[in-house]
From Swiss-Prot:
Catalytic activity as recorded in UniProt: a fatty acyl-[ACP] + malonyl-[ACP] + H(+) = a 3-oxoacyl-[ACP] + holo-[ACP] + CO2; (3Z)-decenoyl-[ACP] + malonyl-[ACP] + H(+) = 3-oxo-(5Z)-dodecenoyl-[ACP] + holo-[ACP] + CO2; hexanoyl-[ACP] + malonyl-[ACP] + H(+) = 3-oxooctanoyl-[ACP] + holo-[ACP] + CO2; octanoyl-[ACP] + malonyl-[ACP] + H(+) = 3-oxodecanoyl-[ACP] + holo-[ACP] + CO2
Keywords on record: Acyltransferase, Cytoplasm, Fatty acid biosynthesis, Fatty acid metabolism, Lipid biosynthesis, Lipid metabolism, Transferase
PROSITE patterns membership: KS3_1, KS3_2
Gene symbol of the encoding locus: fabB
Annotated family: Belongs to the thiolase-like superfamily. Beta-ketoacyl-ACP synthases family.
Cytoplasm recorded as keyword: yes
Protein name, as recorded: 3-oxoacyl-[acyl-carrier-protein] synthase 1
Pfam families: ketoacyl-synt, Ketoacyl-synt_C
Protein task: Involved in the type II fatty acid elongation cycle. Catalyzes the elongation of a wide range of acyl-ACP by the addition of two carbons from malonyl-ACP to an acyl acceptor. Can also use unsaturated fatty acids. Catalyzes a key reaction in unsaturated fatty acid (UFA) synthesis, the elongation of the cis-3-decenoyl-ACP produced by FabA. Has an absolute requirement for an ACP substrate as the acyl donor, and no activity is detected when both substrates are based on CoA.
Pathway: Lipid metabolism; fatty acid biosynthesis
Organism of this sequence: Escherichia coli (strain K12)
Length: 406
């Protein structure tokens, strides 16, 4: 099979709106979590979120942006960055059937779904809904709103698999490359951040509510006093490219994607089984002949999910566990965008030789004892890194990325 490498990165997140800002935040262990007046005013119990600190007004042509939700906007801006980072000219990717795009979101756009329904019930009816709500609200809005303005002629579709969405998009892109169907695939996703989305998670008791007065402390993966995840938004895109194609054009190669796992728990709609995660990591590691130096865990700061994943890691690695950190303690949980964002965080650590910390661990959960959980920024040369992304419905994705070797 052909080999797939990553040659470009683009990101808009709660800890930075480009690669340089994100890198600085990762090194400093800087939290992107803030107080949300919007969530408080909506009547929610959780008043904290990982918001994007960026005014996107005027950043995208109005004829393009009129079709977009925030999820699509974040993914579009990320794709612009990734293309520039990869050194791709328009001639290299536009109108080219060998260049495709796979990008999604976990929740579509609840904001525009609600807007459309509310407008329809109002006095103006359909006129108030307008012609652009469909592309903003539809589940495939992210891929549609990127493929059209970027003139993509290859594959073009969304994957939606809850919090594993954009990791699955990357994995599927790798498979397109391996099978020889595409030379380049832009892969990733975006997620909007709004009360209309957040309230659904608050209603099921999944969000943090104890730290509204200290937002930067609310996301605390592996801490004994964690009480739920902090919802976040943003986007990310990577350029997945066939190795020989990348070498031929002299591209900078961040890493080769040497492993991809995708499994289902088939056990519970919300609670992870752990067994599916074990199979997923083992699948991703199959044929990988170098040890995993660093694992970016799914680690969302939920009481059950965190320790289920750690138990799975123990089963997979035994007494040879890699260094582990959960970047969601800094960023919050961006749902469908989390997979690609955390792949990018892992790639930046691989590129720059360090491990970002799991912050806010004041009292380590006893079920995390004995594992190499990194709580301070650590300089270390890395060769092979793993990123886990798991979601409701028992969906699992694992990516293994390695510095290129012959």
């Amino acid at each position: 099979m052909k080999r797939a490498v990553i040659t470009g990165l683009g990101i808009v997140s709660s800890i930075g709106n480009n690669q340089q800002e994100v890198l600085a935040s990762l090194r400093e262990g800087r939290s992107g979590i803030t107080f949300s007046q919007e969530l408080k005013d909506s009547g929610m119990r959780s008043h904290v979120w990982g918001n994007v600190k960026l005014d996107t007004t005027g950043l995208i042509d109005r004829k393009v942006v009129r079709f977009m939700s925030d999820a699509s906007i974040y993914a579009f801006l990320s794709m612009e960055q990734a293309i520039a980072d990869a050194g791709l000219s328009p001639e290299a990717y536009q109108n080219n059937p060998r260049v495709g795009l796979i990008a999604g979101s976990g929740g579509g756009s609840p904001r525009f779904q609600v807007f459309g329904a509310d407008a329809m019930r109002g006095p103006r009816g359909l006129k108030a809904v307008g012609p652009y709500v469909v592309t903003k609200a539809m589940a495939s809005g992210v891929s549609a709103c990127l493929a059209t303005p970027f003139k993509i002629h290859g594959v073009n579709y969304s994957i939606s698999s809850a919090c594993a969405t954009s990791a699955h998009c990357i994995g599927n892109a790798v498979e397109q490359i391996q099978l020889g169907k595409q030379d380049i695939v832009f892969a990733g996703g975006g997620e909007e951040l709004c009360w209309e989305m957040a309230c659904e998670f608050d209603a099921m008791g999944a969000l943090s509510t104890k730290y509204n007065d200290t937002p930067e402390k609310a996301s605390r993966t592996y801490d004994a006093h964690r009480d739920g995840f902090v919802i976040a938004g943003g986007g990310g895109m990577v350029v997945v490219e066939e190795l020989e194609h990348a070498l031929a054009r002299g591209a900078h190669i961040y890493a080769e994607i040497v492993g991809y796992g995708a499994t289902s728990d088939g056990a519970d709609m919300v609670a992870p089984s752990g067994e599916g995660a074990v199979r997923c990591m083992k699948m991703a590691m199959h044929g990988v002949d170098t040890p995993i130096d660093y694992l970016n865990s799914h680690g969302t700061s939920t009481p059950v999910g965190d320790v289920k994943e750690l138990a799975a890691i123990r089963e997979v690695f035994g007494d040879k566990s890699p260094a582990i950190s959960a970047t969601k303690a800094m960023t919050g949980h961006s749902l469908g965008a989390a997979g690609v964002q955390e792949a990018i965080y892992s790639l930046l650590m691989l590129e720059h030789g360090f491990i970002a910390p799991s912050i806010n661990i004041e009292e380590l959960d006893e079920q995390a004892a004995g594992l190499n959980i990194v709580t301070e920024t650590t300089d270390r040369e890395l060769t092979t890194v793993m990123s886990n992304s798991f979601g409701f419905g028992g969906t699992n994705a694992t990516l293994v990325m390695r510095k290129l070797k012959d």
